[in-house]
Amino acid sequence: MEAKARDNNYYTVGMDLGIVKLNGFDVFLFGTPGLLRFKVMRDVIVQGTDGIIFMFDAAHPDKDEDGIIILNAVRKLLMPETPIVYLANKQDLAGARHPEVVRSQNYLPPDAVIFPTSTRTGENLDEALKYIVNQIYENYSSILKVLRIYESDIEGLAKNLDKDKMEMRDLLNNLEIKRFIDIDRLSRTYKVREGMKLLM
């Protein structure tokens, strides 16, 4: 979100929230500004995130230094298995750097996935979103298989996962918030939601 200041320049003043439906599931996208002063906002949003789409401004290498500071701060808060996909944005502009140049100049690992994108034209945005959702699905696929077996036996699930009552409550509540399962608290059962599969 940007606002025009008295000096006629536009400045970032807030965050964006988007919801996209994929395979019947709502994917919540929280867009935080790429400015250092929004650290507190990023720290709050990163808690509980399932994946990160990190955008580099491919047309303005002078913004990379702040970008790397932000990326490193975010990485420290993430669980190790949390996937990150990178975007080399503004490919619609003349002189925009190729994704491999962005990778090299920012010391991203060789296996990091980086898409050439343009938020203005929509280039590769769907592909990047599908990629990160697939990575998230792969992270959850093993637990979803186990959950399907124990839908009417929470105690059996707790035993299988070696979790106590509080840990089970937290796990199931978290999965319900993320809309992977629906909990029936009266019957003390849950149901894994249909539709979870890899996106092509």
Task: Give names to the regions the model predicted.
Residues 92-142:
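Canonical P-loop GTPase G-domain recognition
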Residues 139, 151-153, 183-200:
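Short, cationic-aromatic polyanion-contact patches
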Residues 50-55, 77-92, 108-117:
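Conserved beta-strand/loop subsegment of P-loop NTPase cores
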Residues 166:
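Key DNA-contact positions within bacterial/archaeal DNA-binding proteins
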Residues 2-37:
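Switch I (G2) and immediately adjacent beta-strands of P-loop GTPase domains
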Residues 179:
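Glycine-centered, phosphate/nucleic-acid-interacting loop/turn motifs that mediate DNA/RNA or nucleotide
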Residues 136-161, 169-170:
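Short amphipathic alpha-helical interface segments
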